[in-house]
Amino acid sequence: LIRRDFSRCIQCGRCIAACNEVQVASAIPYPYGRREERSNAPTGWYPVPDYDKCVYCGECVQACPTGALQDKKACVIDLDKPLKKVRTTCSYCGVGCQIHLHVQDDRVVKVTGVEDAIPNRGRLCVKGRFGYDFIHSDDRLTVPLIKENGSFREASWDEALDLVGRRFSEIKEQHGGDSMACLTSARVSNEENYLMQKLARGGFGTNNIDHCARL
């Protein structure tokens, strides 16, 4: 995930401070064990992490001012082409971290945290910073699929929704509303979670509702 080019390292210690004081992973040690002595690093010393402690959050990458530490996947950025920055909310959990998507040729090529925004103040976990490959994955579903005779076929949204509604109605009629349950996701908004519980209670007639954040 992280490319290291120590020929660019100026031993400023920002990566060490990010790791020890922001992420509190202590994966990159101070050369003499104390921050105030980091400017006295021995010749040839570079911030090599303890991989057993590293959580690959990328804080060191975002803090590095020279490019000695870089996001490997961001190395595809063409410096001769414009780079658009789009602010959005990370969808991996319910914290709501604010992120910048760096977009080039209609593809996300890098993700950074928004420094002046709560709740994360620019900080991200490994998923939020590096887990964006799914956006352009060839395996990503783009149309509804219906399983027939052991295989899936493409269907229209109207056909798929009609089938789902019909099957839910059949289950409710045969077994009652309490035979069904809803498990909602931290990757959707509060409003969508609210609508899901409303569907469960008002449509299915069940109070069997849970959320992945509790698991």
Regions found by a protein language model. Name each.
Residues L1-L215:
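N-terminal export/assembly segments and adjacent metallocofactor-ligating motifs
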